[in-house]
């Protein structure tokens, strides 16, 4: 944890003496540091949680200080982000609306968790976030804050100030000489972490506009991807990825390595119109290369390691689990209960899946499972000594009895 202190004794009012701001250095939180200090007359502490933003964190301490923070915390939470948030979601194969790998949804609760620690340490009266009044993040942050520190005041500037658009926010920053990473010409809102990068706003709000190729940071276009396919094998132990091509990596290293490999082969791009929690539809463009590969490999390993009934029921729960994460309910009893069930299903999900990556496509080419339920002798169309074809007749008669009875009764009417 890095802390940068600046001498500051602001005049307090309204009972709020100190506020911890969830700080990223982006447009919204950059102007919020200044706005909170101006409008609440209190001490402002900036807290940035590192979940894999990379270069976005460079110079953040100095920037926070220049913008009005008395202290700035940068907390490295990358390992916890992977082990406590990403890995459980891989075990479930949770996709929101069958498309979204939940990159932002998973980052918000761990950011809130670390900010809550700083609020307690600083004995702050309030916590502040930069989520807009139209987005999902306001719900995710505030439900997490209420779960972790129910008695702390929450300040949401986008629901208080006169700034109505990103253009207004850019003007506010310009008047106060606050450096921000967007312009009116390219007002994209982006969110980056180990698991993905998301892009929203600007020209993307018109559904007829194709995204600009220059926007992408983690992946190349299919046209620029290698003409030769890339092969790799992902090994899992009890549902958790542990190695690539036999080489073991730490959780953060594994995700980072897969992002590089898959991104170079144009894996993991998605242009989605999704249903926001607050009721509207919105368009988001995402890069999730490691997520796409790990989900594909894990799902394939499960197909040979888990029995039919458990697998089918688990697939139903995956949809609900994705909603829980997306809707900001990570700290709910239901999510904890589902994790207990999911962990039980993963006891025998150990093995390796070989994949071929080619110009945006993920192709499964080989499977090995320590506890495989697949039997070549039983599945073969050639002669075998286990399966008696005559047994099928009795099974079909019993299985089809309700169908037969329904048809007979309807015919007699």
From Swiss-Prot:
PROSITE patterns membership: ARGININOSUCCIN_SYN_1, ARGININOSUCCIN_SYN_2
Say which enzyme class the record assigns: ligase
Q: Where in the cell is it found?
A: Cytoplasm
Pathway the protein contributes to = Amino-acid biosynthesis; L-arginine biosynthesis; L-arginine from L-ornithine and carbamoyl phosphate: step 2/3
Q: Which organism is it from?
A: Endomicrobium trichonymphae
Q: Which top-level group of life is the source organism from?
A: Bacteria
> Which cellular components does GO assign to this protein?
cytoplasm
Give the GO biological process terms.
Answer: argininosuccinate metabolic process; L-arginine biosynthetic process; urea cycle
UniProt lists the family membership as follows: Belongs to the argininosuccinate synthase family. Type 1 subfamily.
- What protein is this chain from? Argininosuccinate synthase
Top-level taxonomy:
Bacteria, Pseudomonadati, Elusimicrobiota, Endomicrobiia, Endomicrobiales
Q: Which residues bind ATP?
A: 22-30, 130
- GO molecular function annotation: argininosuccinate synthase activity; ATP binding
As its record notes, the protein acts as a catalyst of: L-citrulline + L-aspartate + ATP = 2-(N(omega)-L-arginino)succinate + AMP + diphosphate + H(+)
Q: Name one Pfam family in it.
A: Arginosuc_syn_C
């Amino acid at each position: 944890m890095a802390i940068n202190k600046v001498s500051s004794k602001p005049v307090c009012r309204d009972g709020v003496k100190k506020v911890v701001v969830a700080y990223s250095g982006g447009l919204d939180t950059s102007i919020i540091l200044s706005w909170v200090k101006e409008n609440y007359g209190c001490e402002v502490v900036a807290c940035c949680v590192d979940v894999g933003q990379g270069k976005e964190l460079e110079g953040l301490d100095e920037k926070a200080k220049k913008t009005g923070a008395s202290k700035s915390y940068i907390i490295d939470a990358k390992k916890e982000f992977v082990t406590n948030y990403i890995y459980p979601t891989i075990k479930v194969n949770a996709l929101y609306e069958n498309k979204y790998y939940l990159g932002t949804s998973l980052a918000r609760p761990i950011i809130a968790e670390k900010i809550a620690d700083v609020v307690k340490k600083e004995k702050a009266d309030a916590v502040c976030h930069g989520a807009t009044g139209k987005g999902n993040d306001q719900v995710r942050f505030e439900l997490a804050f209420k779960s972790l520190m129910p008695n702390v005041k929450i300040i949401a500037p986008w629901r208080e100030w006169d700034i109505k658009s990103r253009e207004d926010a850019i003007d506010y920053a310009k008047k106060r000489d606050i450096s921000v990473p967007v312009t009116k010409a390219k007002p994209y809102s982006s969110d980056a972490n180990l698991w993905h990068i998301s892009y929203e706003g600007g020209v993307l709000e018109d559904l007829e506009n194709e995204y600009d190729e220059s926007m992408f940071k983690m992946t190349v276009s299919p046209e620029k991807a290698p003409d030769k396919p890339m092969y790799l094998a992902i090994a899992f132990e009890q549902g958790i990825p542990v190695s690539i091509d036999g080489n073991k990596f730490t959780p953060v290293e594994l995700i980072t390595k897969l992002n590089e490999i898959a991104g170079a082969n144009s894996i993991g791009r998605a242009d989605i119109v999704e249903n926001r929690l607050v009721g509207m539809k919105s368009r988001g463009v995402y890069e999730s290369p490691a997520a796409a590969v790990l989900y594909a490999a894990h799902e394939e390993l499960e197909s040979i390691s888990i029995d039919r009934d458990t697998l089918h029921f688990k697939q139903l729960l995956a949809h609900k689990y994705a909603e829980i994460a997306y809707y900001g309910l990570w700290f709910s009893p239901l999510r904890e209960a589902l994790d207990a069930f999911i962990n039980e299903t993963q006891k025998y999900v150990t093995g390796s899946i070989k994949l071929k990556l080619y110009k945006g496509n993920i192709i499964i080419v080989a499977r090995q499972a320590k506890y495989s339920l697949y039997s070549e002798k039983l599945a073969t169309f050639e002669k075998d000594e286990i399966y008696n074809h005559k047994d099928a007749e009795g099974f079909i008669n019993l299985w089809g009895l309700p169908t037969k009875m329904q048809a007979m009764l309807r015919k007699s009417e």
